Amino acid sequence: MTTRLELLPDVYLTAVQTSRFKTACFSLSFLRPLRAGEAAMNALLPSVLLRGSEKTPSIRAIADRLDELRGASIGALVRKKGEIQLTGLFADCLEDQYAGEAVFSHLLDFVSELLFCPRTEHGAFVPELVSQECRNLQNAMQSVLDDKSAYCEIGRAHV
């Protein structure tokens, strides 16, 4: 069963429930019109959010926190559907019944912390982290252009 909740205008939480797997997963997505002036910044946002929060200020601290959640994982989500850009975070963890504790709710709280209390300096994202993630995004885009088979697959997806 899939549950999709609109938390705020154009902000959705999607949770998939099934007994087929021993893991639980969810995604939190922002839907934005695809605009040339915003696309790169929208694509950058999830990676910057994954660089830390007020309470968990580093990648290392995030990794430690995920380890405490029985090896849960969180990743960036960037997709294009027609003229809509979908960006956000996805997460998965061991189902509570197999973990013997409430891992899912703690993971949901942690993702909320990353989203609503990001690591900032003077009321804005940390400039150094934004620059690093910008370079990472540029390198990832260049690596797709350099890999002819990957580039071909992108072309096929849009035909």
Residue positions per predicted region:
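Acidic/histidine-enriched alpha-helical segments
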Residues: 63, 117-141
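N- or domain-start disorder-to-order transition segments that initiate the globular core
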Residues: 1-25
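Short, hydrophobic/amphipathic alpha-helical patches that form generic packing surfaces
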Residues: 47, 113-116
